[in-house]
Amino acid sequence: MRLIPRLLNFFYRHLYHGLAFTYDSVAAVVSFGHWTEWINETLPFIQGTRLLELGHGSGHLQRVLLDSSSSVNARSGLFVVGLDESSQMGRLAQRRIVRAGIASPRLTRGLAQALPFHADTFDSIVASFPAEYIVDPRTLSEANRVLRGGGRLIVMPAAWPKSRLLQWLYRVTGESPTEVVEIVKEKWSQHFIRAGFEVSVETLEVKSSVLLIVLARKLTEK
């Protein structure tokens, strides 16, 4: 029963490192071409001007955040940082952002479980389709530490295209997105609460897809 998780971990490890150059292609296939659209749906939930992206990957959201025409970038004093454990992803993101005409992106290599930032630094932290590290108590403790009081951790753990093929597969396999939503609500929420967050789990329907969003607000000290 543990074989599948091990295979998935092996796949993800290589996808983020030695096979990082295939990441965008794989993401496009598994999302039916909606990958960047899904990631951009986190933008309306971002608050404040000091932003951290955990697991910036190949830099799609970083590019949008730093685009001078974006609604987020219009905020005065915007400060955006991206963090990823993979040096290969760092190089891909750097190239993407520089090609977009942004001279000096703030990208750093590191672990979410040991963030290299001072306490109370960020207004928002965002993570799109993160691996299991996101519910590691060390990750959530670090996110709570570097967020300002009332700051927001935004996590998009899953999304589904509105596809007839997928609906058929759900019927055949007996599985459905509803099960994932319930797991996140019942199990993930407890991790966030124990780390000092007030948490809500929302499903967001857009034109082509259904997205799962976790919104965790850092509780302010009384």
In which residue ranges do the predicted regions lie?
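Conserved class I S-adenosyl-L-methionine
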Residues: 2-46, 60-64, 168-174
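Class I SAM-dependent methyltransferase SAM/SAH-binding core
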Residues: 52-114
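A short acidic, Gly/Pro-enriched loop at the edge of an enzyme's catalytic core
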Residues: 113-124
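A short SAM/SAH-binding and catalytic strip from SAM-dependent methyltransferases
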Residues: 124-135
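A short glycine-rich, Lys/Arg-flanked "PGG" loop and its adjoining helix->strand segment in the class I
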Residues: 138-149
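Conserved beta-strand signature within the Rossmann-like core of class I S-adenosyl-L-methionine
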Residues: 151-158
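Short alpha-helix
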Residues: 180-196
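Core SAM-dependent methyltransferase catalytic element
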Residues: 196, 203-222
